[in-house]
Amino acid sequence: LYGMDKIAVTCGHYDAYRKNAEFEDSLELSVPLAKVDNHPLNQCFNEDANNLVKRIEADLVYIDPPYNSRQYCDSYHLLENVARWEKPQVFGVAKKMDRSGMKSKYCTTGATKAFETLINDIKAKYILLSYNNMADKGNCRSNAKISDEDILKILNAKGTVKVFEESYKAF
């Protein structure tokens, strides 16, 4: 996955490509070495968080849902496909696979309800949430789907909330 980005004719994501871009002569794909001293009870999941939290309990749950209307699957479908090695049919000039079943409700007007359901279903001592609200700094597609007020209301209904804010430069 790291090697793919070095020869991609994209701008860091895979939703669009740069026409007439030059490729390197070769691509070397290497497998990163897994960390061998991980605690044996640590687990990593790759599935819809709203489904996952119904089946697990944890000390800490870290969530980083999509912030705006830009669907992750549109930008990172190629990396996801290589990681899973599913080789789906592709279509169109850009040779994209059908991603309709991968769309996230967090990128729609249903984001607040999906977030509330997620938080209510989490069984953990701590929830760590990363959420970027650009407010009026970006274009309309960059605007957060869940307001800060709704996030705080939902989290406060679950338990004690501490907010840590970090300034950032919008691009």
What are the language-model segments listed below?
Residues T160-A170:
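Conserved S-adenosyl-L-methionine
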Residues S104-G159:
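Conserved Class I SAM-dependent methyltransferase catalytic core
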Residues I63-P66, E80-V82, S147-E149:
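Short, low-complexity, polar/charged sequence segments that are solvent-exposed and flexible
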Residues V31, N51, R55, N81, ...:
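Charged/polar, solvent-exposed surface patches and flexible loops
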Residues L1-Y76, K87-D98:
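SAM-dependent nucleic-acid methyltransferase catalytic core
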Residues S69-Q71, A135-G138, A170-F171:
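Flexible loop/turn segments at secondary-structure boundaries
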Residues S69-I122:
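SAM-dependent methyltransferase catalytic-core segment centered on the flexible catalytic loop
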